[in-house]
Amino acid sequence: YTTLFRSTGENSELSMNSVVLPKANEIADTRTWLVHGEKNCLSRQLHKSIAMDAGKAVFNGMITVTPQALKTDGQMTNNNLLLGDKAQIDTKPQLEIYADDVKCSHGATVGRIDDEQLFYLRSRGIALSEARKMIIHAFAAELTESLENSVIKTHVLERINQRLSEV
């Protein structure tokens, strides 16, 4: 999916979060472009991918700060979890800044389930498959816990559980 947002008013705020769970040979292609066009704007983006089997997640994100968008504060993060030997992640967070007095950052992480976390949970008597699910849910929790609408939160958690049960 592609999301484009342009802040056209001073002091505008945006929070944009997403989670994708490609599996088998699926490709989840996420593209965001946020243009800060006025002063004192704030944005927070958090995008997470959990690539299973031979699934592939692609993230291309851009924050553009125009010359008049002084005092802008923009942040974009893309965290990725690889769950299959053939799973792939391509991530490209970008900043395009044309103003001097701004605070913007971007970052990306790609990793697998930590063996030490698995060992800790297994040493407490938790089955391997359940321990993996707990770690994956913890990875996604930063997004799911921030959902204020209980109907949407329930739907997202059910969808994550459904995708994980197929692995």
Annotated model-derived regions:
Residues 2-126, 140, 147-167:
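Conserved beta-strand/loop scaffold segments within soluble protein domains that form the structured core
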